[in-house]
């Protein structure tokens, strides 16, 4: 007859074996090649002409991204006409794009054959930096959309958001971005469940990619709805102004020009990032689709987006363009270093012109 100690020791032994088996299912010590080979994603062994060209182009674009967005941040800092909450948020968007440039710069030196040298931790860091930069950009664009919506519909000449609140918003944006980028590193990955591994991102779990992709796409939709609401409101006010106001047409043209600038910035972001996010969903929902053939193209498209905003500002905003030239030419003028007469009126903010037209319209109707 078995003794009591045998009955007790047998379950304990089984539990320890189960625990050991469970631990053996995690592959933290495996090479990156192990995950890539299992997912079927190609992992280069040597540099070819195309890889060198892509790396050279990528590094060049990264340097331009960082310098151009640094120029935007400096321009907003030195020109007091830009010292409004909306421009602080735009500066933070430039900071997010600057961070994206750093993330892509790190990626360029750890891609191709160099990917094989990465550990699980450094691979997750590489991807986490890109995820953080995207989340920061999305959250910042959403904050700008909400600020514009509130300001326009409350008919305020200047937003009542204090500088302290702007700082709080910026801190929240970066906190959310860092958390979203760090989630896979702290456990939401497929290292312990290889069946859930993605083909495009071999160490990421499908469930996390679904969550991350849908989160960003829903945010895109919310921003589009907010700006569409603003656009309809502005168009209605413009029509009323044209019927009842004898004010100059220049104000209305400026108003629509500023609205177009905002829409172009948002539109460029959505156009550059949506294809890549949809590709992630196809990777999960359509395993037979050859989505890996298009991965690098969409990644490059997303990278170019971080360089677009400074170009858009330079082309669409004369004040910003003039400030860029003064900085690059090392000029110091009264216009840049201090507010001039009527600088508040000339600050290129959408709601300034809207409200001028609205008040003029109300007076004419009365």
Swiss-Prot record:
Alphabetic keyword roster: Cell membrane, Disulfide bond, Endosome, G-protein coupled receptor, Glycoprotein, Membrane, Receptor, Transducer, Transmembrane, Transmembrane helix
Residue intervals on the Cytoplasmic side: 78-85, 147-165, 228-257, 318-366
Tissue: Expressed at high levels in oocytes and at lower levels in brain and spinal cord. Below detection level in lung, heart, kidney, liver, muscle, stomach, and intestine.
Extracellular compartment segments: 1-52, 110-123, 187-206, 283-296
Cystines in this chain: 26-192, 190-197, 286-289
GO process terms (BP): adenylate cyclase-activating G protein-coupled receptor signaling pathway; adenylate cyclase-inhibiting G protein-coupled receptor signaling pathway; negative regulation of neuron projection development; neurogenesis; positive regulation of MAPK cascade; positive regulation of Rho protein signal transduction; positive regulation of stress fiber assembly; regulation of cell shape
Subcellular location: Cell surface; Cell membrane; Endosome
Main location: other
Protein task: Receptor for lysophosphatidic acid (LPA). Plays a role in the reorganization of the actin cytoskeleton, cell migration, differentiation and proliferation, and thereby contributes to the responses to tissue damage and infectious agents. Activates downstream signaling cascades via the G(i)/G(o), G(12)/G(13), and G(q) families of heteromeric G proteins. Signaling inhibits adenylyl cyclase activity and decreases cellular cAMP levels. Signaling triggers an increase of cytoplasmic Ca(2+) levels.
GO CC terms of this entry: cell surface; cytoplasm; endosome; plasma membrane
UniProt similarity note: Belongs to the G-protein coupled receptor 1 family.
Membrane association type: Multi-pass membrane protein
GO molecular function: lysophosphatidic acid receptor activity
Residues carrying sugar: 29, 37
Name of the protein in its database record: Lysophosphatidic acid receptor 1-A
TM segment ranges: 53-77, 86-109, 124-146, 166-186, 207-227, 258-282, 297-317
Annotated a 1-acyl-sn-glycero-3-phosphate binding sites: 41, 126-131, 212
Tree of life domain: Eukaryota
């Amino acid at each position: 007859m078995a003794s009591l100690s045998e009955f007790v020791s047998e379950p304990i032994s089984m539990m320890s074996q189960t625990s050991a088996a469970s631990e053996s299912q995690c592959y933290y010590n495996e090479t990156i090649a192990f995950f890539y080979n299992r997912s079927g994603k190609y992992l280069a062994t040597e540099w070819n002409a195309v890889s060198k060209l892509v790396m050279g182009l990528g590094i060049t674009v990264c340097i331009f991204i960082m310098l151009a967005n640094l120029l935007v941040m400096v321009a907003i800092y030195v020109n007091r006409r830009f010292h409004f909450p909306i421009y602080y948020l735009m500066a933070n968007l430039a900071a997010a794009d600057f961070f994206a440039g750093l993330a892509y710069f790190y990626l360029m030196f750890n891609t191709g054959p160099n990917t094989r040298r990465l550990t699980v931790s450094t691979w997750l860091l590489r991807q986490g930096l890109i995820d953080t930069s995207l989340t920061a950009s999305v959250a910042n664009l959403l904050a700008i959309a909400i600020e514009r919506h509130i300001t326009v519909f409350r008919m305020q000449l200047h937003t009542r958001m204090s500088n302290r609140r702007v700082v709080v918003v910026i801190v929240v944006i970066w906190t959310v971005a860092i958390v979203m980028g760090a989630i896979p590193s702290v456990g939401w990955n497929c290292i312990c469940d290889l069946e859930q591994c993605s083909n495009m991102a071999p160490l990421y779990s499908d469930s996390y990619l679904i969550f991350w992709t849908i989160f960003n796409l829903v945010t895109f939709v919310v921003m589009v709805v907010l700006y569409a609401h603003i656009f309809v409101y502005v168009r209605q006010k413009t029509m009323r102004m044209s019927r009842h106001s004898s004010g100059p047409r220049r104000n209305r043209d400026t108003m629509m020009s500023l609205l177009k600038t905002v829409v172009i910035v948002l539109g460029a972001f959505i156009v550059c990032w949506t294809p890549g996010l949809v590709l992630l969903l196809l990777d999960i929902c359509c395993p037979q689709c050859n989505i890996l053939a298009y991965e690098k193209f969409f990644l490059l498209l997303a990278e170019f987006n971080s360089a677009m905003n400074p170009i858009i500002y330079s082309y669409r905003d004369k004040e910003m363009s003039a400030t860029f030239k003064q900085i690059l030419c090392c000029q110091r003028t009264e216009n840049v270093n201090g507010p001039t007469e009527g600088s508040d009126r000339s600050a290129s903010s959408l709601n300034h012109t809207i409200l001028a037209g609205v008040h003029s319209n109300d007076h004419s109707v009365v």
